[in-house]
Amino acid sequence: MFSQTLSKIINRKDLSREEMDRIFSDIFSGNLTDAQIGAFMAALATKGETFEELAGAAEAMRRKATRIQAASPVVVDTCGTGGDGAHTFNISTTSAFVVAGAGICVAKHGNRSVSSKCGSADVLEALGVKLDTQPEVAEEAVNEIGIGFLFAPLFHGAMKYAIVPRKELGVRTIFNMLGPLTNPAAANCQVLGVFAPQLTEMFADALNLLGARRAFVVHGHDGLDEISVCASTRVSELNDGRVQTYDISPEHFFEDRARPEDMAGGTPSENAQITRHILSGKEKGPRRNVVVVNAGAALVAAGKAEDLKAGVALAGQIIDSGKAHEKLEQLIEFTKSNG
C-alpha cells in the first residue's frame, strides 16, 4: 500500500483526503520507517500539496493529539505557519491577548522558534507563563480565564515518529504547515498567517474541509505571515463555507504605512518587553497598529465585530481599557499556581 501511494506522488498524481489520512495515520502510529517517511515527504514537497491532502494529514494528526474541551462554542486561534524569515516580534501571540480581552475564548496553539529568534512559546516563557503544565491545566485556563497556551509538544506526542526524517531532510515539508490546522481545542475561528501567497486559498479550503466556521488566511506582500501594516496583504477569507480572496492595504486602517524595521523583534526577553508595552498601552506606534489589525481580524472571525475596520477600532479600545494586559497577567498567575 505504501509503495503504491509513494509511486502515485512520484508520478505527480494528487492523493485523496482519505489516502492522505491513511498514510499519516501510519506515520503517527509508528508503522513506517524513517526512510519511508523521508521519501514520502520529499516526493510530496516536490509535487506540491493540495488542500485535500493538507486536510487529510491534519485529520490524522488531530485524532492522535491530546484533545481539550472548550466550553465556548466559539474558539479562536491566531497560530500561523511561521517560516517567513522576517524576524518580527510576536505579533499573533500579542494579538491573542487582545482577543481574549474582548471576552472571546482563545486557545493559542504554538511552539518554540523554528525559523526566528523567538517563537510563541519562547516569548510567553519570557513573560512568565509556565509552559510545561499538564494539558488539563491548559484546558482549565481556556475555560476559566478565557485564554490558554497549547504548547504543541505536550499535545502532539505522535510527532516523535517524524523527528529524525524531518531533521535529516532539512527542508520545508508538509509538517511545517500542519500546526495551524491541528489545534487541540478544535478552534473554529482563526487568523492564520502563511509563508507564501499561493498558500492562502489552499489553507482556507483546507480549513473549510476541517469544519472551521470563519477564518482569515493571510500573507503580507512584504513576506510577513501576518496582516501587514508595511505593505498590502493577500487575504483568503472563509465565511459560511465560501472562500473569497482579496487584498487589503494599510491605508484602509491607518494614515501611514510602517517600515519593515518597525516590526523587528529580538531575543525572547526583548520581545516580551515589546508585548508588555503594547498590551499595557504604552506603545502607540506601528507595533500597536500591526497587533490591532491582526486582533481585529480575529474579532471579526469570532463574530464580535462586523468588519475589519470595526475590528481594528474594537481592538484598540480593548488595549486602552487594560483588559488585554489583564488577560496576560491572569494567564501568568494561573500557570504558576496550577503548574
From Swiss-Prot:
Residues that coordinate or bind 5-phospho-alpha-D-ribose 1-diphosphate: 80, 83-84, 88, 90-93, 108-116, 120
Catalytic activity, as annotated: N-(5-phospho-beta-D-ribosyl)anthranilate + diphosphate = 5-phospho-alpha-D-ribose 1-diphosphate + anthranilate
Binding site for Mg(2+) 2: D225, E226
Entry superkingdom: Bacteria
Pathway: Amino-acid biosynthesis; L-tryptophan biosynthesis; L-tryptophan from chorismate: step 2/5
Protein residues bound to anthranilate 1: G80, N111
Binding sites annotated in the UniProt record for anthranilate 2: R166
Residues involved in Mg(2+) 1 binding: S92, E226
Gene Ontology BP term (one): L-tryptophan biosynthetic process
GO cellular component, one term: cytosol
UniProt entry keywords in alphabetical sequence: Amino-acid biosynthesis, Aromatic amino acid biosynthesis, Glycosyltransferase, Magnesium, Metal-binding, Transferase, Tryptophan biosynthesis
InterPro entries on file: Anthranilate_Pribosyl_Tfrase, Glycosyl_Trfase_fam3, Glycosyl_Trfase_fam3_N_dom, Glycosyl_Trfase_fam3_N_dom_sf, Nuc_phospho_transferase
Gene Ontology molecular function: anthranilate phosphoribosyltransferase activity; magnesium ion binding
EC number: 2.4.2.18
Coiled-coil intervals: none
Cofactor detail note: Binds 2 magnesium ions per monomer.
SUBUNIT field: Homodimer.
Family: Belongs to the anthranilate phosphoribosyltransferase family.
Role of this protein: Catalyzes the transfer of the phosphoribosyl group of 5-phosphorylribose-1-pyrophosphate (PRPP) to anthranilate to yield N-(5'-phosphoribosyl)-anthranilate (PRA).
HAMAP family: TrpD
The protein's name: Anthranilate phosphoribosyltransferase
Organism: Desulfosudis oleivorans (strain DSM 6200 / JCM 39069 / Hxd3)
